[in-house]
Amino acid sequence: MFARLAILLYAIVSYAAFTVSFLYALGFVGNYVVPKSIDVGSPTNLGEAILVNLLLMSLFAIQHSVMARPAFKRWWAKFLPLACQRSTYVLLSSLILLLLFWQWRPIPTPVWQTSGIAAWLLIGVHWLGWLIAFASTHMIDHFDLFGLRQAFVAFRGTEISGQSFRTPLLYKIVRHPLMLGFLLAFWATPAMTAGHLLFALANTAYILVALQFEERDLIAEFGATYQDYRRRVPMLVPRLFARRRTDDRKSPRPVGAPR
């Protein structure tokens, strides 16, 4: 009983760390409220700023991707109970994000500056991105994604069941709405600086690469079900018009049209 309670408390602490890092990320990326943001901080030379910022983002990318791979999960399952594995992943990710926010070096050189309607539109898209990202976690299983469900199930002494494949709401429009939301939040800004551009470019590159590994894992887990989903639903960019399916019925071919 004590071990199960400790795992539950650990999961709650981990979720609290995630909440702090997520809320700070809103201010960090958008330059709102927080004392140190993507464009606000102590000045430093350009070379140091680029190097430190890339190292910080690389640290997050390596931890986030390596710990998500099935081979790593099999390895650390030898040492860590299943009920607290996700919480550990979330806690380490959150702490690295907080380190990034703390040690980030601003590069304030302006890239673009907008005003008026254009600025308000970009601010709107920015917040829409955060809303999409947050809502996407609740469309699947928010508490499973951040480790609380596993801890509560273990606390009750029941078996942790696997998740079935579902495509609710935004997942019918794009396969990875969470990542789409992040991209919108990172890129949509009325005042883009060189530091913000570096952040957006590096994270976009990471997301595009990481999704290839995630898709491979999903195919391995769900097989033909996910393959069919990939054929029907785009990865990140929604289709403006739904493509007509020709598998079941074909449109009549005009006379003289090539076979």
Curated annotation (Swiss-Prot):
PANTHER family: NURIM (PTHR31040:SF1). This is Methanethiol S-methyltransferase 2. Belongs to the nurim family. It catalyses: methanethiol + S-adenosyl-L-methionine = dimethyl sulfide + S-adenosyl-L-homocysteine + H(+). Its EC number is 2.1.1.334. The chain crosses the membrane at residues 5-25, 46-66, 88-108, 115-135, 182-202. The lineage of its organism: Bacteria, Pseudomonadati, Pseudomonadota, Alphaproteobacteria, Hyphomicrobiales. Catalyzes the methylation of methanethiol (MeSH) to yield dimethylsulphide (DMS). Coiled coil: none annotated. GO terms for cellular component: membrane. One of its GO terms (molecular function) is methyltransferase activity. InterPro entries: MddA, NnrU_dom, Nurim-like. Its main location: membrane. It holds the Pfam family NnrU. Keywords: Membrane, Methyltransferase, S-adenosyl-L-methionine, Transferase, Transmembrane, Transmembrane helix. One of its GO terms (biological process) is methylation. It is found in: Membrane. It is a multi-pass membrane protein.
